Amino acid sequence: MPVEFKLGNSGYTLGVEEELCIVDASTGELVPKIEEIMSRLPEDLAEAVSYELFQSVLEIKTPVCRTVGEAERVLRELRGRVGSWTAACGASLASAGTHPFSRYRDQKVTEHERYRQVIEELRWVATREVIFGQHVHVAVPGPEEAIQAHNRLAEQAPLLLALSANSPYWQGMDTGFESSRVQIFETFPRAGMPPAFPEYAAFEAYVDLMVECGAMDDYTFCWWDVRPHPKLGTIELRVLDSQTHLRHAVALTALTQCIVASSLEDEDAPKGPYHRDIALENKWRASRRGLDAAFFDVDERRNVPARDLARAAVERLRPHAQQLGCEEELLGVLEIVEGGSGSRRQREIYEKSGDFLDVVAFLIEGTRPALAGEPS
């Protein structure tokens, strides 16, 4: 059965989703406050905030935005206003790929049929999924363009992960990884690096087969790091850890948008399926070592430091950023390259104090922009 692709556009409009921790204002623990928060939100925020698998998680999401700058303004307002309503419920918002110490066994599942289905089918695998990601949608003109962008974005997923790595701690321990989140999530079926599709028909055939064999209801149960999203007319990047600082989330959004534009507009852009085996190895290195990793470059047949690749990507993509109006935001990637990802900062704080509460306090403070729309 065809998977109809809603016609997108050639302007690379975008949308961003951020999954955030709901933490107790005094203990720093994850708390199941989503129902209370949702019940208090004013009507104009209702469509911008969503439930997730657990009651200690909420998602904020932008509408379709024409530019990265527009998305930044929306996210700033959402972080501020939703954060204020969360505070009115005795909790705080914190953004990272994992919570440093809260236990997954203590989390309450959200009452929703889809989530009930996920827990019933995946059991222990799903109960451990107390993780938080940033998703970026970029509109593309049609289905074949979606597959071209899919392959090129998948090639760059390891670099994007290294830049976003923000989950060194989990269940009260140092995992030894810069991004432990992706290691946790890859225990899901149909997760991790996606298939290397040669054309849209191959994606449709995959979806048909998985539905026919009873693995899933529809393509939204493909939880890959990158996936076409036909209902929205977009390509969706899902590999990013949630970012503590909004400016880093915005920089990664700009990088994603520019990669998609480059994949469809550059005459010398690679065509066809990406080299999935190499991408899998590079992703492992990104998860383990973040920006200290070196990735294998298939064309040059050598390992290249992640920071060098990031700098080169920014320089190569600047013309697209200028055209899209996000050059300043794209240059924010260099701040991450020089200053380190969120994992580095979390470790610096913990190594100094030995107290995970200080890490959570940093996450809360970093997540909070200038507050707007205080509850009355």
From Swiss-Prot:
InterPro entries in UniProt: GCL_type2/YbdK_subfam (IPR050141), GCS2 (IPR006336), Gln_synth/guanido_kin_cat_dom (IPR014746), YbdK (IPR011793)
Superkingdom of the organism of origin: Bacteria
Pfam family, one: GCS2
Keywords from the UniProt entry: ATP-binding, Ligase, Nucleotide-binding
NCBIfam families: gshA_cyan_rel, PRK13515.1, PRK13517.1-3
UniProt cross-references to HAMAP family, sorted A to Z: Glu_cys_ligase_2
Protein name per the record: Putative glutamate--cysteine ligase 2-1
